């Protein structure tokens, strides 16, 4: 039912704006801003492929997702996130010690992230890094 109520897909410029704001809030440790950028019913899904640490079940809700993402940032303050293109869409690639650790893609509605997908599976990342 929620999908039927969704507006038109966000423009590329809007996705880039939200991803940049998300990156800035993450780097600043601004929990309140992270929550603001996430839709109340946001769903976070991670793919670790059984080879990388990743939540095995979807995480739902802005505060829960923001807490998860903030905790990851606190554990690894040296991470560097860059805006990249994946399958023709804007995404965030996060590097640790120069190595690609994960790629985040999002769906946006009304200026907020409604779906957050993280790929941390090293096999998929190797493929992405060599494209």
Language-model-derived ranges and their functions:
Residues 1-71:
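Solvent-exposed, charged amphipathic helical/linker segments at domain boundaries
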Residues 62-131:
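Low-complexity, glycine/alanine/valine/leucine- and proline-rich hydrophobic stretches
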């Amino acid at each position: 039912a929620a999908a039927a109520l969704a507006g038109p897909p966000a423009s590329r410029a809007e996705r880039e704006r939200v991803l940049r704001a998300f990156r800035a809030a993450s780097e600043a440790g601004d929990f309140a801003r992270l929550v603001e950028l996430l839709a109340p019913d946001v769903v976070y899904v991670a793919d670790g492929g059984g080879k990388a640490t990743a939540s095995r079940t979807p995480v739902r809700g802005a505060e829960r997702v923001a807490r998860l993402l903030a905790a990851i940032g606190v554990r690894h303050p040296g991470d560097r996130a860059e805006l990249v293109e994946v399958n023709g869409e804007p995404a965030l690639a996060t590097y640790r010690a120069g190595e690609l650790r994960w790629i985040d893609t999002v769906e946006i509605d009304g200026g907020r992230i409604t779906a957050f997908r993280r790929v941390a599976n090293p096999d998929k990342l190797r493929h992405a890094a060599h494209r």
